[in-house]
């Protein structure tokens, strides 16, 4: 977090109460502002939405609590929401992913309350989330936007009932978070509607497959420096994220092995030319491992004991539970920290060394800068449009997890296609009549 200066932007200025926990380094805000401006140039959808929101003011008088990775792309989203009149309070969605220069810029340049700092412990992480919700006496949020479900779960377990009752609705941007929220809805806990922004055809294609693939490989290479060509690389999970990672690794020359529990996804992997094995059989032959399941205990002590000397471990899931880091630490006789930036070498009693990247946390945001701006432009554009819909018509949605309205998904795709110079055909009257009729046959 960073100290406040004169606020800039369209939303109401607010004092940065979180600044008392973080003193900005001189010049940090200027550095962050430059990086935000660079990303803005590659995010035309949010630029268009900011202009629309500035005219329509869908968030006038509303407070939005956000729990997101504090990156330059997130800052562009925050500025778009403020253009629509929102007051925004931002906490990080991962203890290690905050880019402090971006936090400083949002606080000093935009007057946003940012409760985030890179490298905080678990207690401080959740304290920041509570501050973003208004735990220090501030008015609670009208809308929420989450990335992993920590903010929404904290709101339900630690907030006052009056604060929970104030929330009109929210958005969740990750598959992991959507799964958590669906479990909350199933047991009757979820008290307001949440739109699953990650669960759309557009997001699965652009964000999960292309964005995650590129940024995870980027983080892996930055942290390890490994040559992927001819390496045996094991990807745990072949969903939208895992399949994209596998394709990208194969394109760089890796020999990719897939582990899966879902027979349909496993069949998909086989038909795309990948070898599919149980993790217990993949462990002894793998040289690089990337977990992308959204589950827990994927690589356990049993598997760690099988790994060859020099094996590299990276996690692409939202939480640090896919690789059993505690078991790895217990097995090691020595831990050589920071042998490379964001890479720790665990030396085992028999002399083997295993390289753990980003402490087992999400490697693309800890060891790299996350998704490219073009990817986050579309993902955040869908969330911004969904929040605007909730701001005006949340009473039409019951508590629970809801899909992104199809018209929002299509609108976001059309706007991005326009910025890319692509043009679509339209159905003729005859084609539309054919689609609408059941009488026309062979």
Outline where the language-model segments fall.
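Short internal beta-strands
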Residues: 86-98, 257-260
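ADP-ribose/adenylate-binding Rossmann-like module
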Residues: 92, 143-148, 160-175, 304-347, ...
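Glycine/serine-rich phosphate-binding loop and adjoining beta1-alpha1 elements at the start
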Residues: 15-59, 92-231
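Adenosine-phosphate binding glycine-rich loop
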Residues: 15-18, 27-45, 59-63, 71, ...
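Glycine-rich phosphate/diphosphate-binding loop of Rossmann-like nucleotide-binding domains
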Residues: 68-78, 84-85, 207, 211-296
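A short helix->loop->beta-strand "cap" motif at the edges of active sites that frequently abuts
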Residues: 85-87, 112, 163, 192, ...
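Rossmann-fold NAD(P) dinucleotide-binding segment
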Residues: 51, 82, 136, 140-141, ...
């Amino acid at each position: 977090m960073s100290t406040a200066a004169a606020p800039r932007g369209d939303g109401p200025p607010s004092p940065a109460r979180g600044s008392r926990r973080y003193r900005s380094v001189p010049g940090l805000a200027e550095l962050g502002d430059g990086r935000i401006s660079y990303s803005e140039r590659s995010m035309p959808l949010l630029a268009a939405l900011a202009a629309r929101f500035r005219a329509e003011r869908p968030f006038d008088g509303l407070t939005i609590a956000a729990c997101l990775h504090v990156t330059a792309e997130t800052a562009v989203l925050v500025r778009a929401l403020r253009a629509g009149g929102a007051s925004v309070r931002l906490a990080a969605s991962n203890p290690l992913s905050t880019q402090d220069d971006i936090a400083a810029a949002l606080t000093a340049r935009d007057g946003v309350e940012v409760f985030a700092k890179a490298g905080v412990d678990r207690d401080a992480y959740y304290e920041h989330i509570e501050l973003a919700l208004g735990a220090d006496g501030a008015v609670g949020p009208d809308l929420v936007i989450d990335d992993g479900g920590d903010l929404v779960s904290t709101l339900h377990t630690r907030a006052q009932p009056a604060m929970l009752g104030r929330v009109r609705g929210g958005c969740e941007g990750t598959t992991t978070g959507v799964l958590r929220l669906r479990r909350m809805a199933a047991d009757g806990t979820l008290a307001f509607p949440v739109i699953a922004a990650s669960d759309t055809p557009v997001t699965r294609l652009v964000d999960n497959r292309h964005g995650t693939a590129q940024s995870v490989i980027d983080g892996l290479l930055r942290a390890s420096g490994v040559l992927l060509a001819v390496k045996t690389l094991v990807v745990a999970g072949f969903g939208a994220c895992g399949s994209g990672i596998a394709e990208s690794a194969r394109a760089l020359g890796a020999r990719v092995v897939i582990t899966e529990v879902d027979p349909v996804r496993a069949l998909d992997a086989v038909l795309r030319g990948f070898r599919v094995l149980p993790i217990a059989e993949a462990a002894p032959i793998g040289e690089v491992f990337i977990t992308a399941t959204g589950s827990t205990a994927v690589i356990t002590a049993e598997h760690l004991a099988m790994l060859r000397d020099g094996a590299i471990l990276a996690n692409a899931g939202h939480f640090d539970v896919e690789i059993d880091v505690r078991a790895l630490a217990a097995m090691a006789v020595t831990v050589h920290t920071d042998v490379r930036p964001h890479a720790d070498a665990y030396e085992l009693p028999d002399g083997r060394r295993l390289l753990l990247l980003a402490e087992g946390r999400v490697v693309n945001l800890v060891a790299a800068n996350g998704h490219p701006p073009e990817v986050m432009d579309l993902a955040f554009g869908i969330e911004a449009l969904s929040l605007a819909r909730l701001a005006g018509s949340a009473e039409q949605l019951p508590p629970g997890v809801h899909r992104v309205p199809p018209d929002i998904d299509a609108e976001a795709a059309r706007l991005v296609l326009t910025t890319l110079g692509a043009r679509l055909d339209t159905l003729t009257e005859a084609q539309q009549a054919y689609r609408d009729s059941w009488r026309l046959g062979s």
